[in-house]
Amino acid sequence: GFLTAEEKSLVNDLWSKVNVDEVGGEALGRLLVVYPWTQRFFQSFGDLSSADAIMGNGKVKAHGKKVLNSFSDGLKHIDDLKGTFAKLSELHCDKLHVDPENFKLLGNVLVCVLAHHFGNEFTPPVQAAYQKVVAGVANALAHKYH
């Protein structure tokens, strides 16, 4: 696999403390605020007119929760990310035509949110392991483009 045993345990130890529902909504919300061009994929989500509107939007929270539950699932199959995300890759790439660059942006936002939530616990080695994971997931999601 692309993660060492040590990195896997760092990732899993922190993940066991993550409130997936809350962090998912915050990560997706921040993506839409920080990178406003990503909003075009979410036009059916209602009010995205301001940071407050986005962060309080129920549909954004619900989709963020779905996104992070999938990510959680990916962590359980860390050595087969391509297989785990094949269906979602097809949906996002073929049907929704999401630019794969956006998966990288969301991964980086997720890392920021984790750093924000966990503070000192989010040590440089933990961050390094998570950067590898989000890059791996983004890569797996972009797989259908190649």
From Swiss-Prot:
Family, as annotated: Belongs to the globin family.
Cellular-component GO terms for this entry: blood microparticle; haptoglobin-hemoglobin complex; hemoglobin complex
Keyword Metal-binding attributed: yes
UniProt entry keywords in alphabetical sequence: Acetylation, Heme, Iron, Metal-binding, Oxygen transport, Phosphoprotein, S-nitrosylation, Transport
Gene Ontology terms, MF aspect: haptoglobin binding; heme binding; hemoglobin alpha binding; metal ion binding; organic acid binding; oxygen binding; oxygen carrier activity; peroxidase activity
Self-association state and partner proteins as the record states: Heterotetramer of two alpha chains and two beta chains.
N6-acetyllysine, modified sites: 59, 82, 144
One annotated GO biological process: hydrogen peroxide catabolic process
Tissue: Red blood cells.
Ranges where the Globin domain occurs: 2-146
Disulfide bonds: none
Protein name: Hemoglobin subunit beta
Sites of Phosphoserine modification: 44
Organism this protein belongs to: Proteles cristata (Aardwolf)
Taxonomy of the source species: Eukaryota, Metazoa, Chordata, Craniata, Vertebrata
Modification S-nitrosocysteine occurs at: 93
Protein residues bound to heme b: 63, 92
Domain of life assignment: Eukaryota
Function, as annotated: Involved in oxygen transport from the lung to the various peripheral tissues.
